[in-house]
Amino acid sequence: MAAAALRDQLTALLSSMFSQGLVDEQFQQLQMLQDEGGTPGFVSEVVTLFCDDADRIINEIATLLEQPVVNFDKVDAYVHQLKGSSASVGAQKVKFTCMQFRQFCQDKSRDGCLMALAVVRNDFYDLRNKFQTMLQLEQQIQAYDPKQQ
């Protein structure tokens, strides 16, 4: 009974992530790959790698924007990398924010980049918190029924 309640919570969480635009069909594809391939932990591994990578990239961008003379090409390269990582995991909102961020890089606008950094950081932290909750629910479900991924 408890596993069913946890599955309901997980379903509601995933549904809210889609409806809020945090994730898109690419994330759904990752889930399907896990289900069809019978590879438990695949989504967990991909999400964890994405979160670690995105956190590192955001910190690198912040460091670059603190410099007296900003290397906008370097900032843009990191934002492009974050956009690609976001797209591959289905992190739709972060991906769209990165697209806007890149425009500020091309305009060489420090203020615009700082504003975009705050937005992308907020979007990422929101998504990361949801991913962490999702992974915790999946672990709890698996503890009740080890045959489930």
UniProtKB/Swiss-Prot annotation:
Histidine-containing phosphotransfer domain (HPt) contains an active histidine that mediates the phosphotransfer. The keyword RNA-binding does not apply. Coiled coil: none annotated. This is Histidine-containing phosphotransfer protein 2. Functions as a two-component phosphorelay mediators between cytokinin sensor histidine kinases and response regulators (B-type ARRs). Plays an important role in propagating cytokinin signal transduction through the multistep His-to-Asp phosphorelay. Functions as a positive regulator of the cytokinin signaling pathway. May play a regulatory role in salt and drought tolerance during plant development. The modification Phosphohistidine is found at H80. Widely expressed.
